[in-house]
Amino acid sequence: MARIAGVDLPRGKRVDIALTYIYGIGRATALQILDATGVNWTRNVDDLNADEVNEIRKEIEQNHKVEGDLRREISANIKRLMDIGCYRGLRHRRGLPVRGQRTHTNARTRKGPRRGTVGKKK
């Protein structure tokens, strides 16, 4: 089983699909990586030899930010927004939509479950 960036790639899948199991690599990036390394994207992970796996691993390490590094960078960016006190940072801090969506109705995913109103029972 090929292990790249701390992720075990699934054995029976095509290489381009298997690379998307790595956080930060989608289909387009996977195809770019395979073009750069010269590996045919229609091959299965089982069919790759050690040299090809090492080429892919080297390409990802040198030119792409994936897994832990990418997660750390994203959380640092959000923390920076919260620290400087900008509008986007305040929205992150309050757990509300950041990009201008309406919140009078909708936005339930971001706001969490509804709090029931405590009212007079008839």
Curated annotation (Swiss-Prot):
Coiled-coil boundaries: none
Residue intervals passing through the bilayer: none
Region described as Disordered: 95-122
Lineage: superkingdom: Bacteria
Cell wall biogenesis/degradation among keywords: no
The keyword Transport is annotated on this UniProt entry: no
Entry keywords, A to Z: Ribonucleoprotein, Ribosomal protein, RNA-binding, rRNA-binding, tRNA-binding
MF term (GO), any: rRNA binding
GO cellular component: cytosol; small ribosomal subunit
Record Pfam families: Ribosomal_S13 (PF00416)
Family that this chain belongs to: Belongs to the universal ribosomal protein uS13 family.
Assembly and binders: Part of the 30S ribosomal subunit. Forms a loose heterodimer with protein S19. Forms two bridges to the 50S subunit in the 70S ribosome.
Job description of the protein: Located at the top of the head of the 30S subunit, it contacts several helices of the 16S rRNA. In the 70S ribosome it contacts the 23S rRNA (bridge B1a) and protein L5 of the 50S subunit (bridge B1b), connecting the 2 subunits; these bridges are implicated in subunit movement. Contacts the tRNAs in the A and P-sites.
Protein name per the record: Small ribosomal subunit protein uS13
Organism from which the protein derives: Nitratidesulfovibrio vulgaris (strain ATCC 29579 / DSM 644 / CCUG 34227 / NCIMB 8303 / VKM B-1760 / Hildenborough)
